[in-house]
Amino acid sequence: MKPSIYSLTRNDLIAWTIEHGEKKFRATQIWDWLYRKRVQSFEEMTNLSKDFIALLNENFLVNPLKQRIVQESADGTVKYLFELPDGMLIETVLMRQHYGLSVCVTTQVGCNIGCTFCASGLIKKQRDLNNGEITAQIMLVQKYFDERGQGERISHVVVMGIGEPFDNYDNVLKFLRTINDDNGLAIGARHITVSTSGLAHKIRDFANEGVQVNLAVSLHAPNNELRSSIMRINRSFPLEKLFAAIEYYIETTNRRVTFEYIMLNGVNDSPENAQELADLTKKIRKLSYVNLIPYNPVTEHDQYSRSPKERVDAFYDVLKKNGVNCVVRQEHGTDIDAACGQLRSNTMKRDREKATAGTAQ
């Protein structure tokens, strides 16, 4: 299977072009066609020779994704189900925010982190996405807006879809540098957020990369016992190790860390839990922020339900009284398969049922 040309960084593309007997400026032309003009075939690159276009076609695909399903919410949220060249399925979500268009990308096919409340882990990790497959998600969503002709552009990216980004570290890093490139999509680093479930050693590595993107940590519990019971990763990276890495990140980058905290009724949403969370984050309060997330129920995890508004409000009040910077996240796409991984999981279930029915006939 040929790789997507999106899998090449700009430096990779320059090296490949020179290696194949062309001048460096040809790489600049290709990059411009891909990310500024956003063409979907090499034939549209009209300032390249036919022989060079043939060489590109021989070695690369442009966009490796095929659109399977699109769900649009009443609030303007759009959820895409894309099929990869090997038939695997991934999700991408577009959210309309007051500050612009934000896209949430997937980094792995399935997830091995094992959070007990999450739809993403219903199907175990089958492989990493390469950086071209991650970039292609942005390009296909942007293509939709280009075709509408209203001049709308993706302004923000969150790496919070299916999978653990830091478990696919190198590909995610290449993706970040591609979409941030001033000569391409030029999405500002401070408009990009990467979320991790808590791979402490990778947080330290990320601190040393010099990228100015935002970091979010999926915390979801304020003590080791509770966090280990709902997030298996805490057994490998308990809170002491995780927070040591977070403190290192803040000291190294002087950048704020956001904590994601999903509100599970009767599990992690008591005033006592809120006080524990305030105490846990006290040392880094000036450069941390807590995002309280309403839970989107998942059929396969029916032991969990959404915290009622009064419990969320009480939790929020405790945090605010302790001086914690926090917000209750605005919901998106509640009338479609809203939970991360849910559309993919439901589609795969329907595909299996159809296959079984066909075999029975």
UniProtKB/Swiss-Prot annotation:
Protein's GO biological process: rRNA base methylation; tRNA methylation
Chief location category: cytoplasm
Cofactor note: Binds 1 [4Fe-4S] cluster. The cluster is coordinated with 3 cysteines and an exchangeable S-adenosyl-L-methionine.
Family annotation (Gene3D superfamilies): 1.10.150.530, Aldolase class I
Binding positions (S-adenosyl-L-methionine): G163, E164, S195, S218, L219, H220, N296
Alphabetical keyword list: 4Fe-4S, Cytoplasm, Disulfide bond, Iron, Iron-sulfur, Metal-binding, Methyltransferase, rRNA processing, S-adenosyl-L-methionine, Transferase, tRNA processing
Annotated residues for binding of [4Fe-4S] cluster: C111, C115, C118
Subcellular location, record wording: Cytoplasm
E.C. numbers: 2.1.1.192
Remaining remarks: Reaction proceeds by a ping-pong mechanism involving intermediate methylation of a conserved cysteine residue.
NCBIfam families per record: rRNA_mod_RlmN
The protein's name: Probable dual-specificity RNA methyltransferase RlmN
Source organism phylogeny: Bacteria, Bacillati, Bacillota, Bacilli, Lactobacillales
Gene symbol of the encoding locus: rlmN
